[in-house]
């Protein structure tokens, strides 16, 4: 992006103020930082993975970053622009519990069919285990569950109709009624 795009267009800024939890000033700061890190104005998967690697240096964050990238990339074009980035950041950092659950569901629903299968859940849980690294996982995972055991425990609590799939409704209902499920989904057993 050249000098023409170094500032957010007023209509884009207004749209983001209306559709995120950030103020106009915060959006301008985030945009400035985004352009500093991504002069082209877009992030590709490899660049996104490098950001995750910086935050999780003790494990392998590449697989989890791939899933987060897919969830951030709303239009499916293989890149994340500022709008996609800031909207996802708004939900994950300042969104309501309901918004965060919807976002998490999207991440776990790998094929986007509106249902989470055991294999989809296992894929994400394994990616979380790899991302945080063995030493940290041992401290966090005080119950000693393997990824498969964690998936089984989550499905036992969430899959109300026992069809081996979790719908968005089941996901939200279980998370609201039992906060420990959210901890299981995050693989964070510290209370």
Curated annotation (Swiss-Prot):
GO biological process: response to heat
Residues that, per the record, bind Ca(2+) 1: 73, 75, 77, 79, 84
Positions with a binding annotation for Ca(2+) 2: 109, 111, 113, 115, 120
GO MF annotation terms: calcium channel regulator activity; calcium ion binding; protein domain specific binding
Binding site for Ca(2+) 3: 159, 161, 163, 165, 170
Keywords recorded for this protein, A-Z: Calcium, Lipoprotein, Metal-binding, Myristate, Repeat
Record Pfam families: EF-hand_1, EF-hand_7
Gene3D superfamilies in the cross-refs: EF-hand
Domain EF-hand: 24-59, 60-95, 96-131, 146-181
Domain of life of the native organism: Eukaryota
Keyword Metal-binding tagged: yes
Residues with lipidation of kind N-myristoyl glycine: 2
Further remark: Probably binds two or three calcium ions.
Family under the similarity heading: Belongs to the recoverin family.
Protein role: May be involved in the calcium-dependent regulation of rhodopsin phosphorylation.
UniProt name for this protein: Hippocalcin-like protein 4
Gene: Hpcal4
């Amino acid at each position: 992006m050249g000098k023409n795009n170094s500032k957010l267009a007023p209509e884009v800024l207004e749209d983001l103020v209306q559709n995120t939890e950030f103020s106009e000033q915060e959006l301008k700061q985030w945009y400035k930082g985004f352009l500093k890190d991504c002069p082209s104005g877009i992030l590709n998967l490899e660049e996104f993975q490098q950001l995750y690697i910086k935050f999780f240096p003790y494990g392998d964050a590449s697989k989890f970053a791939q899933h987060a990238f897919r969830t951030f990339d709303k239009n499916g074009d293989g890149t994340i622009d500022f709008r996609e980035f800031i909207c996802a950041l708004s939900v994950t950092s300042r969104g309501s519990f309901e918004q965060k659950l919807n976002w998490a569901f999207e991440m776990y629903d790998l094929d986007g069919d509106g249902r989470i299968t055991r294999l989809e859940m296992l894929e994400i849980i394994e990616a979380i285990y790899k991302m945080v690294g063995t030493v940290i996982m041992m401290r966090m995972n005080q119950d000693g569950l393997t990824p498969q055991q964690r998936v089984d425990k989550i499905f036992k609590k969430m899959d109300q109709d026992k069809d081996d799939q979790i719908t968005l409704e089941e996901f939200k209902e279980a998370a609201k009624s039992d906060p420990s499920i959210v901890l299981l989904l995050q693989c964070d057993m510290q209370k």
